[in-house]
Amino acid sequence: MTTMIGQTRQAGSSSYEQAWQAEQAPCPGMEPDTLTVGVVVVTRNPTFFQTGLSVLNDIRDYVFNRVHIQSELPLKLSELASDPLYSEAREKAIHFLKNQSKALNIQVIQCASLAEATGKIIYTHALEQQPEFQMGMLFYDQTSLGNVDDSIEKIDRDLDAFYSAMQRGGIPAFYTTFSTVTFIRDVRSSFRYLPQQYREIVRSEDPAIFQTELLCLWMDFFEMNYTNRRVKPIGALALHNTLAEQLIQFFERTAASRWLVSYYTGSIISNLIGYLDRHAEAHGALVLRGPNEHAIACGAMANWQLYRMPFLGVVTSGMMDEFKGTLINLKETAAQGIIVAAENRNNQWYSFQGTQTPTEDMRDVLAAKRIPYVYIDDVDGIADGLAEVFRLYHQAQGPVVILATQNVLESTLSLEPVPGDLPPVSGLPAYDCPPISDSFEQAMALINEGPEKLVWQLGPVSDDEYALVHEIADAAGLALVDSLAHPGSAPKYYQGKRNPHYLGTLAIYGYSPRVYNFLHTNDKLNPMSDQSVFMIKSRVAQITTPFSDGRLERKVHLVQLTHDERHLSPYADLKLHMDCLTFLRAVKANLHVDAALREKRKALIAAYLDSPSDVVSQLPSLPMSANYFFCQLNRVIENLIKTENFDFTGVYDVGRCGISAVRNVAKTRRGFSGWYGRALMGDALLATSYLAHTSPTHVVAFIGDGAKGIVPDILPAFIDNILTHPQLLNKSITIFYFCNGGLSVINTYQERILFNRTSRQMRLVNVDQPAFEQTVDDFHIQGKTLTHFDEDTIRHALMTPKRLNLFSVVLGHNNEGDGISLATAKGWQRDPSDREALQERKDWAARQPESTSTSFDQGQNKEAIS
C-alpha cells in the first residue's frame, strides 16, 4: 500500500481530504478545463474505494488537471493486479485520452450512504459557491450497505431522489445511463428487468475483473458524457415533444374520465413515448403496457367495450400489421382512439421497416379496411394533420391512425393547442320525446299484448341501459339472455341477488339447455306466434344464435334494435333503427302489460330447469371433463356470490373452455369475450393484463391451451404494470389455463358432426409447469397445476386481494354438452323436456309467490330437503 501522490491531510477525526495539482498539462496541447466534475462513491468498503482511486491514479497523467478527494475512508492506493485485459483496456483508454483537448478537474466524494452524499454536495456547493461544479459519475456499492441488495425499484427511487435534489439545488448533473452504476452481490433471481436510473453490475471478487470494470465504466462515462457535445449536464430535465403534448391536451379535453395509453417502443417513437410516460398520467391517462403490439389493441378493445375508455396507442415503423384482426374488431366495436404509427417519407427508397415503397402502401391497406388515417410528414403540417385526426375521431367510427415520419415524431416545436372539441350536433331527438314509428308501435304491442314467451338477447348494453332493461323485464315478464360475444350483458346475479329474468346464453356455441328448452318443444322450435326474440343492440350476426339462415328467416320471429342502419338484418321481422337508451325509455313510458300475462311469462321462465343438463358434469373422472370442472367451479362461485358478495369481471377466450365458462359459470356483470368479431384466440388473454388494472372488481379469465400458446406470455408485462401501478391491484386476478392437449371445438366438429377421427392438426403439446410463488412489493403471484378440483385452493384464490393466480387445469376432451352444436342438444344425457314434465313445472311455477326468484330445480330441492 502506498500513499497517494499530492498533499494529504486528515480533515477531522473521521474524514480525509487530499488535493493533487498537475504541474503542467497532462498532454501537449491540452488546456485546463474550468469545470469540475464530481465523482461520488457511496461505499463502506475500503477495498472498493481504494481500488477505484488506484484506477483513476493509473491514468491521472493523461486526463486530470486537478483532483480533489474528500472521504470517510483512509486515502490509500491498492496495488493493481497484473492482468493482460486490464493492460489492454488501459492502453486504449490512454490512447483515447491523449487526443482530448482539455484536461479534467474532478472532485471525488466518498460517503457511507446516498443521503450523506446528497447533503455533502449541496452543503459544499452552497458554502463554497462552486458555480462551475457539475455532478458527474456515481458509483453506488450496494454490497457494503446492509445484508441484502435493495430492490431495483427502491434503488431507482433513491437515485431519482438524489438527482432531483441536485436539480433543486441548482447543481448541474450528467444524468444518463452511463453516469450511474450500482454494484450488487449476485444476479437477481425470480424476475429481472432493466433499471431506469442506473446500470447494474455484480461486484466481482476477482481483483483483475473488478479493476477492469471500473476503468471501463469511467471511460464509458467520459466518452459518452464529458466529450459528447450533445450531452449537457442538465439533470432530469425532460425534453419537449410536440405530438405527445397535443395528444395529451386533446384527450384531457375530450375524455369523460380516464383514458388509456399503451405502447410498444421503437427507436424513432421513443422520445414521444418518453414524454407520454412522464406527463400523460397527470392529465387523466392510465399508462399500461402489454407484451406486444397486438396486446395494445386487445386492451383497448376490452376497456372500450366495458368502460367506454378511449385510448392512445403508439407503435413503431412497420408494426400496423401486428395488431392483427383485432384492429378490425376495434373498428367494429367503434372504439374511440388514436393509433400513432411511425412511417417513412415518401421519397425514401425502401426505408427500413417502412410500409410506403414502390411495391406496397399501408395507406391502401387501411383504406381497404375502412380505417381512417392521416399521414403527417412535415413539422409544419402537424397542426392541420391533428385537426383532421380530431375531426375523424369525433365521428366515433373506430380508431384513427396517424402515420407520422421521424421528424414529426421527434419535433419539439411549440404549438398552441389544436382545436379538437366535439362539434355541436343539432337535430338529435330528445330522449324524453322519441319519434313513435310503426315499427316501435308493433314492438310495444308484442311487449304489452304479445306472446307468453318474449326473449330479449342483450348486446353490449351499458350499466344504465341494463338498469332500464331489468326494470322493464320485471314489469313485462321478459326472459333475458346474454351471448357468446357479450357474456354477462344479462347477468345471472344482479346487484348481489339472483336475477329471476335471466334464462341463460343464446349463441352459435354455448347456448344453455334452459334457453334451448324454452324456445323448443320436443326438439322443435315453437311456432312464431308463440314466441318472439328481441335482439337489443345487435347486428343479428351468425354468432348470436345456433340457428341456420333458413330457420332465422322462416322459423324465428325476430325484432332487431340497432342505432346503425348498416346493421339492419334481412332476417329481422321488425327493424328498430333507434338509439338503445331512447328505445328503453320509450318502452318504459309505454308499458301496459296485463298482470295475468306478466305472471304467466314469469311462471314460464321459472318452470324451465336451470341445470347443466348432463351426467358427466357430476362425474369426477380423471382427467376431469370440462363439464365437471365448470359445474364445480360454478357451485363455488355462486356460493361466494351469495355468502361473500363476490363480484367479478369474466374474461373468455376462444375455445371449448371459454364456451363452457360463458355457458356454465354464473356472471355478475358484463365480461369481455375474445369471441367478439374475428374470434381471435389469445385476444382475451392479452386483454386480461389491462383489465386487471381497470376492472372495479375481481377478474377471472378462462383461457384454453390453444389461446395460451398463440400469444406471448403475459406475466412479464403484468409485473411491469404492477411496479408502475400497485395501487390499482387491490383485487384478485385469476387466470385458468385449461390444458386438454387439443383444439377441442375442431375435435368435436370432426368427431360429432362429420363422424371423423381426430388427427394431428388438433393436437397441442402441454408442457408441465412447475409450481411457483413470487412476491412483487406486497402483490403475490402463484402458479399451480390442478389435476383435481381443489375447492379450498380455488375459493381462497378467488377471494384474496393483491394476488395473481395462474392455474393450469388438466382436462380431458369430450364431445358432450356445452352447446357446441344443436346435435348435442338431443343427447341421452339431456334433462327431459316433454310436454308432461313441462306442464308439471309450469303448474309448480304458478303456485309460487309473485316475488319468487327461484327456478323449478331450486324449488324442488328445497321441497325435498324439507
UniProtKB/Swiss-Prot annotation:
UniProtKB keywords: Antibiotic biosynthesis, Thiamine pyrophosphate, Transferase
Gene Ontology annotations of biological process type: antibiotic biosynthetic process
Enzyme superclass (EC): transferase
Keyword Membrane annotated: no
EC number: 2.2.1.12
Effect of loss of the gene: Cells lacking this gene show a white phenotype and produce 4-hydroxy-2,2'-bipyrrole-5-carbaldehyde (HBC), 4- methoxy-2,2'-bipyrrole-5-carbaldehyde (MBC) and 4-hydroxy-2,2'-bipyrrole-5-methanol (HBM).
Annotated Polar residues bias: 849-866
Residue spans of biased composition, Basic and acidic residues class: 828-845
Cofactor(s) required, per the database record: thiamine diphosphate
The reaction(s) this protein catalyses: (2E)-octenal + pyruvate + H(+) = (S)-3-acetyloctanal + CO2
Gene Ontology MF annotations: thiamine pyrophosphate binding; transketolase or transaldolase activity
Pathway the protein acts in: Antibiotic biosynthesis; prodigiosin biosynthesis
Region of interest (Disordered), ranges: 826-866
Physiological role: Involved in the biosynthesis of 2-methyl-3-n-amyl-pyrrole (MAP), one of the terminal products involved in the biosynthesis of the red antibiotic prodigiosin (Pig). Catalyzes the decarboxylation of pyruvate, followed by the modification of the resulting two-carbon fragment acetaldehyde at the C3 position of the 2-octenal (1,2-addition of acetaldehyde) giving 3-acetyloctanal.
Family: Belongs to the TPP enzyme family.
Name of the featured protein: Thiamine diphosphate dependent-3-acetyloctanal synthase PigD
